[in-house]
């Protein structure tokens, strides 16, 4: 794993990976990249990722906060960092 930061938030059915490193989309600019997974597979999640894409990058911390709220709304589950 490249040097940087990573958090994984468990929402029951989905997990949200949040990273920032020299290889992530926007990481060298201090921005974040997210991916949503369902078990071992990354998945598209309408309202979170774009159709045909399982990763979303170049996100500010406010963008990430908004995504955390959206996934909470979608799942009805309070996220827990794992």
Indicate residue ranges for each PLM-predicted region.
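Catalytic phosphate/metal-binding cores of nucleic-acid and nucleotide-processing enzymes, i.e., regions
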Residues: 1-82
